[in-house]
A protein has these predicted regions:
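Acyl/amide activation-and-transfer machinery of modular secondary-metabolite enzymes
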Residues: 78-86, 130-137
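A gly/proline- and charged-residue-enriched helix-loop-helix capping module
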Residues: 79-120
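Short catalytic-loop micro-motif centered on adjacent basic/acidic residues
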Residues: 112, 170, 275-279
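Short, high-confidence coil segments that cap the C-terminus of an alpha-helix
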Residues: 46-48, 106-110, 215, 271-273
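Active-site/acyl-donor-binding loops of N-acyltransferases
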Residues: 67-69, 122-146, 273-349
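Short beta->alpha junction loops/turns
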Residues: 91-92, 173, 281
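A conserved beta-strand-loop-helix scaffold within acyl/acetyltransferase catalytic domains
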Residues: 2-56, 62-73, 116-253
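Aromatic (often tryptophan-rich) hydrophobic motifs at membrane interfaces
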Residues: 82, 96-101, 204-316
């Protein structure tokens, strides 16, 4: 623990903190929830910690962070493998206490914060804006026909086209998770030249969510019954999270993504949920942003904030770039790419 000013900043490993502390607001969104953090811990062996401040016998403020120390960089990330991560901050001045504690404990580490709604983090003078992404969320509290009416005409047209062709969407069983993963691997390898997330990541998601009836994999099937796309939806609080999507290369004529999303809205309504979180989109992903806009969703900015200590040298990540290009060449067998992903992806925290 570290005494700074009037209050004590204390630290515990995350898994210990989840067992011994009453951390308020953990279920405020998916990324701060114990289920999601457990998936990250099991998949990537993340070094996750909690710093917290107590007042009047209760935890008043806390932040959850990942300590990253590898051949690529040294950093404190709030928080790795999350679209965004707003900390639980009671007073704006608490950011100063946490910042000073992190700087004292990790003087050579940069600090990275994925901020969506925490105004106190954006106002903290030590943090600089590094970049921004787009974030979308959809209010689905109105009757289904009203939600449908708010979608763009092009979205409606694509859904109707998909239905007319004969595409069917249904909730998948665990055995079909492999079909989803294969399309995910194909898309990342052949279209984007990126590592796929390792299969164990999706397997742990299934254990934490689908086996507890807190999510679902919706699969799209062409008229011949072939799996051509899928969406993974996760539930936290009153919100359904549109977490992962993939579709078969060359399946555009079937418009599976539009139908999958519409069925996701219906899934949210069936579970009496109020909102649909569409996640983040890079500003260069114009097609994805347009798709989300056409669902009737509203948008905000995810702001990447950071602090860099004097003399910090950013890695050029030449080894990572080489490995990525090498493993995603067209002649690379899929089992080799999957193996490479299981080794490399933990370094992408």
């Amino acid at each position: 623990m570290l005494a700074i000013g009037e209050f004590m900043v204390k630290t515990l490993p995350l898994m210990e903190a989840l067992k011994s502390l009453n951390l308020p607001g953990l279920e405020r969104n998916l990324f701060s929830s114990p289920d999601w953090l457990t998936v990250l811990y099991k998949t990537y062996n993340c070094h996750l910690f909690v710093k917290y401040i107590e007042r009047e016998g209760r935890i008043a403020s806390y932040l959850i962070y990942c300590v990253v120390k590898n051949f690529l960089e040294w950093k404190i990330c709030i928080c790795s493998y999350c679209d965004y991560f707003d900390c639980y901050i009671e007073r704006p001045d608490d950011w100063k206490l946490f910042f000073d504690a992190l700087r004292k404990e990790y003087p050579q580490y940069r600090i990275a914060v994925r901020n969506l709604r925490d105004e106190s983090a954006r106002a903290f003078p030590e943090f600089k804006v590094l970049s921004q992404e787009r974030f979308h969320f959809l209010d689905v509290r109105d009757p289904l026909e009203v939600v449908w009416k708010r979608t763009h005409d092009s979205f409606k047209s694509a859904v109707k086209q998909s239905q007319k062709i004969g595409v069917k969407v249904r909730k998948c069983e665990k055995k079909e998770l492999r079909d989803f993963f294969q399309l995910h691997l194909d898309l990342r390898k052949n279209k984007y030249r990126l590592f796929p997330q390792p299969y164990r990541f999706f397997d742990y998601i299934w254990q934490q969510y689908m086996e507890k009836d807190r999510g679902g994999l919706l699969g799209a099937y062409d008229p011949d019954g072939r799996f051509i796309g899928g969406n993974i939806y996760l539930i936290c609080g009153d919100t359904l999270y549109y977490k992962f999507n993939t579709s078969q290369l060359g399946s555009l004529k079937y418009r599976p993504n539009n139908l999958l999303f519409w069925e996701g809205i219906k899934f949210a309504k069936e579970r009496n949920l109020n909102y649909l979180d569409l996640g983040s989109s890079g500003w260069n992903q114009e097609g994805l942003i347009l798709f989300k806009n056409h669902t009737g969703a509203k948008s905000l900015d995810i702001t990447h904030l950071g602090f860099t200590p004097p003399g910090y040298k950013f890695s050029q990540k030449r080894i990572l770039k080489f490995m990525t290009r090498f493993f995603t060449t067209r002649w690379m067998p899929d089992f080799m790419l999957e193996w490479g992903s299981s080794i490399i992806y933990p370094y992408l925290a």
